[in-house]
């Protein structure tokens, strides 16, 4: 509602203080505070009728990241979880040495100190967990750095001989320990992660892509000197280097705990969006779309904007908007998606779908179709049990 689905004719307590502006596409209007993205509306398919029934961050993020409702208790690293979209798509790519099948940046998603489920490979197994990588540059959201010691830092200045020596020693230990182990353990999962990290450090195209200082200064500036922009720039460089799937978190790491900028605007929605969140989002996303087009990559690169849910149409007493999964907007670009279109609509107040209601599962099915994957494909978990990867139907966006 604050970005892709303005409601200029709604009552004041619903529409808020933001105005709407024309875009590059006749008849499509965006929020006034994303003027740069508005110039690229011809590349975007806006879906204004997504909805689900999960009102909490943990559950809302899970259903959007996996395309399935949570069943029972869900844990961040649970192997009974449905795999994330990134893990699912990466499963269909042929492995290449030194190039991870999926990367996520710059840190994990948290809600009030608890890591959220939905970013891992779940029942596909640890082999398909996206590699967590730091963004090496940019001002953090709200000045708060959410890094832990779990993110891979490819900027380490290690000589090849040192990495080789360490890997040889670890392999010797592995051979000894391997005689005492049977099925996959947490140690095995860590071992896979470590080997991938070593491969990337040893001259992989991924490590070269990670060095943002090698990028044209004009392009770096186009994305903005902020973690949000530099993360999207790194995303483009990683895709160029051969990484099939990149997931970028454009927010502070914790939605409800501590400081930092995030989209959970229960208080002071309008100044926070206007002064801190939308300027970074507008510059970074518009730069990514322009950059991909300039390099001839947009037709073969699918860009998908996901979130947990929308915000309440009516402004609360704290000048904020609360959780609202009843209807919200998402956007897609590239990868065969026809730009300059809007699918579905919300009602006059932005409270519920008015036409062509769709679900996160339908968004996932659309992504699978764009990637050349049949949404009805069956995959097997580590125990050999079959699962159809998606229950949704692709949207007619092509």
Model-derived regions, located:
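Ligand-binding pockets and gating/stacking loops
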Residues: 1-398
